[in-house]
Amino acid sequence: MTSNDTIAAIATPPGRGGIGIVRISGTNLESLARGILGKLPDPRHAGLFSFLDQNSQIIDQGIALYFPSPHSYTGEEVLELQGHGGPAVMNLLLDRCLQLGARLAEPGEFTLRAFLNDKLDLAQAEGVADLIAASTANAARCAVRSLHGEFSSTIHQLVSALIDLRVLVEATLDFPEEEIDFLQSAHAAEQLATIRAKLEQVLVASRQGNLLQEGIKVVLAGQPNVGKSSLLNRLAGDEVAIVTDIPGTTRDTVRQSIEIEGIPLHLIDTAGLRETSDIVEQHGIARTYAAIEQADLVLLLVDSRHGVTEEDRSVLTRLPERLPVLTVHNKIDLSAQPPRLEENTSGPTIYLSAINGEGIELLRAALLKTAGWQANIAGEGAYMARQRHLQALIQAKELLERAAAWLHRADQLEILAEELRLAQQALSSITGEFTSDDLLGEIFSSFCIGK
């Protein structure tokens, strides 16, 4: 995974802009700097330079910044060339760096080198990418907390507490005749209970952060002409779907992303579900069920004038059992019913009008609740957790549940010790202490080139 060669890349987005940056990282950048700038800039001082080609002709004029090792982003020597942000200028400058011995950086390679040089751990490195990719203000704030090490610090505290408990258990194994009394006197059960409670708090906060990052996929399903497209337009605040009185107008899925309290909701309007001989409409219905398979939540729309019909119940039987369903009785403006939310054994039911907006706020609140959103946690305490973080936390939780069961079994302390070891390993994988090269490659390959 390690490499001592010099890498270079354009660090700013493609296209035209006021400023463009070429970033270089490696060892012994003096010769490269002399080839472009005429000299190595003073460390950590911005200087105005002419950027030169191989014939000493000026490519551009701009700012150069030099960061000596180890006090740089990557932990290596880093040189940043800040010029005018035209693509031709940036490419000429990058080509000059490659002529002088640098190679083009792979996606995420600067941050990978920062990780390998202990400038940040794996969760912080992922925080860099999450901050760049954040689509909402709340997601950006959570990503900054991860980048600054708040998530990692919490994980390290859990790992440290587990190590202390493991030391106690391993020591007990050396004195089998006193093992249970020894563990009881050291309050091992209380220590384990404290670790499990803290882990549960971290898992809840991480789920909130994952929700901020990923959002939820919501499919609008139902029979033709119940107002699915009208509801999509109402939630989106724009005319993103065609609305007519003709059943079967929507033949394909229409996708639109919105935010509710900073949570991305990926809405998918679908073809009306009914028996039809129309080949095109049949394809649309097939795509509807394909979208439902990938959804996190289904809004089943029905006409409030008719209520839930046998056809609607037939649709419900075809939905995956794991999938939460919100039943929406639309068109209350025509049925003269008040907007309301009813909690039923089958799930929440909302009465609303997509045309005049009555009951829409009830739907928004129900969407957040069903998604698991907890504003009191997510405001300042959520961690920008990825799916792999959640999997590691859940694995550690299950291992510690089993460990608690083994704790009072004098003849099974070896199993207890192993469960604790595996739980520690699962948590340590979050920060990269136990991580395969394949996983590192997968994580950093999703980064931008130049980062």
Swiss-Prot record:
Residues binding (6S)-5-formyl-5,6,7,8-tetrahydrofolate: 23, 80, 119, 451
**Cofactor binding note:** Binds 1 potassium ion per subunit.
A GO term for molecular function? GTPase activity
Q: Where is the TrmE-type G domain?
A: 215-372
Q: Name one GO cellular component term.
A: cytosol
Q: Which family does it belong to?
A: Belongs to the TRAFAC class TrmE-Era-EngA-EngB-Septin-like GTPase superfamily. TrmE GTPase family.
Q: What is this protein called?
A: tRNA modification GTPase MnmE
Native source species: Nitrosomonas europaea (strain ATCC 19718 / CIP 103999 / KCTC 2705 / NBRC 14298)
Q: Which gene encodes it?
A: mnmE
